[in-house]
């Protein structure tokens, strides 16, 4: 069976106090590709992580997690140079363009983030179909790995069921008189797992990706540079929401 692994983490929060919130990560099209990434990524991390241990003389082998916010730029570059060999995806939410009633209501915020993730995941899969990496008429297994801490803070509505419905059956939105067509026309198996980033190299890598995307955008905004051009040099596939400013 065809497989696609989509591994995601967030950077920034959906809040009017922040300009953007980001989801970023890596996509693999086979277990072999995923396992190969983990093996080499783990090797790089093992080579640098002892630098960040505060009590080397009392080492208990429980090294600190390597995160976007706690490593030196030289080590981050080394890791990112490896990550960039794979397919990088990004979802950017322009917080200022999101309706206030969504941001101010926890349930509404959770539903919006759930919608945004479903939109991103569907478009990533559709991109792979368009580029003949996935056959829409053959059985497909979709594995989504997300940082569990992200889930606790955002409270997703129902990511699994929403993905199955949208990918296999399509969705009709009667409020806006529009229909989203299905893109998978055979058996579909969707698995969503929420992982401890301290134990998941996939989520750790996604943390570095999302943090890098957010930093690139904030720097571009400050320097008045074109965001799309900046992102295109790093991300293989991106989606920016909402498209229009809220009124």
Regions picked out by a protein language model, each given a short descriptive name:
Residues 1-247:
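Phosphate-ester processing/binding pockets and catalytic centers
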